[in-house]
Amino acid sequence: MNIRFYNAKILTMEEEKQYRIAEGELWVKGNTICYIGDGSDVATVCQGDEVILWDREIDAEGNLLMPGFKNAHTHTAMTFLRSYADDLPLQSWLTEQVFPREDQLVEDDIYWLDILGIMEYLTSGITSNFDMYFFPPKNAQASIDCGFRTVQTSGLNNFGGSVQELEENYLKVNDMGELASFIIGFHAEYTTSRELMEGVAALAQKYHSPVFLHNAETALEVKECKDRWGMTPTQLTDELGMYAYGGGGYHCVHMEEKDFEIFRKRGLTAVTNPASNLKLASGIAPVKRFLDEGIALAIGTDGPASNNCLDMFREMFLTTALAKVRENDAACVPAEEVLYMATTEGARCMGLSDCDRLAVGKKADLIMIDLCQPNMQPENNILKNIVYSGSKQNVAMTMVNGRILYERGVFDIGFDPKEVYAKANAVIRRMK
């Protein structure tokens, strides 16, 4: 479709971190942004181009267009365990509740559970996810069928999967079209043998892929890794050659000095998941330290079983608020920096450089924020309003790849929400 937005406020998220809000128009031709400006230069900019016939012209008065949020760590299909096994420490939660239920999942379950998660993403202004779960091709297919953009990775561990299967999934998902891609990864050091980790490292070398894993989520995880190997998870995975082509870690709460050095030297990304870390009492990530070291930071929700809400507004607020508490410094990690993490930095760690900001030639992955709501007024500082007082209620529209998938409470993903809800409830009822 060809869509023209006019009378809009536009936050492009410039590369140099200049957080300017312009006023004017944004044009989408097919799946690509083809014009951003105040309209006065259209004749010059578009000289020689064919006349665009608009499928829709949207008056965006009172709204802000901005890049969609990039959920840089999640387990989407864990929607079936939302509010099922709560108020437990991480290891008990995993071994006594999560793993036994996950053993009963089949591929068709994954498909419908994933669609449920995608619906929630869209209401939160999330336009892509970095998803780790079983049956990555099935997850990817659910995303494609909804029109959603996904980056899949592997949850390979000692209890399921193989390096051969990881390679097959890597090749298959990366051949499924422009909405799906795959980055090599595995679950965590504490669930994965050295032999498997060596296989992952070899595969990353073969395909020049980054590697991502759960890393330093809890103090116990780090202690036990040091007991086994005499080094932290970051140091071990680096020693195994994981990061020749970059990558990073999810959580990164309990980091040591050498870990920061490795992240900086290898150009790795730390993905913080504050709500999950609070709920599981894992700790508060050293966000300010990462920023001070020049280490890239992105934000994820983690899964709906450990969060339990797939809401980037909550994650952004917690990222900055917890950093202020941890450092006893109300000035650290400003709202603008957090907004950059949730959009541009997330896209880059996911390999989505073609939709990391709003610019001509970039993919049209964008959202429209309704500023005419009590929590967004007055407009003293719109960016700070988004982070400190914004919520899902302000997401008026979510567009992925030029297609409006969610608009003011209505989904256009090709599925009846009631059918999706019924399928998800049937999965968990079967397991009780």
Where are the model-predicted features located?
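Active-site microenvironment of metallo-dependent hydrolases
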Residues: 1-24, 28-34, 342-432
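Divalent metal-coordination and catalytic microenvironments
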Residues: 8, 26, 31, 62, ...
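Active-site gating loops and adjacent loop-to-helix segments of metal-dependent hydrolytic enzymes
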Residues: 80-112, 146-154, 174, 219-246, ...
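Alpha-helical scaffold segments that flank or form the walls of functional sites
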Residues: 82-147, 168-176, 423-430
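Metal-coordinating catalytic core of metallo-dependent amide/deamination hydrolases
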Residues: 138-258
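Histidine/acidic-residue-rich catalytic or RNA/ligand-binding cores of hydrolases
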Residues: 163, 219-231, 259-263, 281-290, ...
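His/Asp/Glu-enriched, well-ordered alpha-helical/loop segment
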Residues: 239-246, 288-371, 389-390
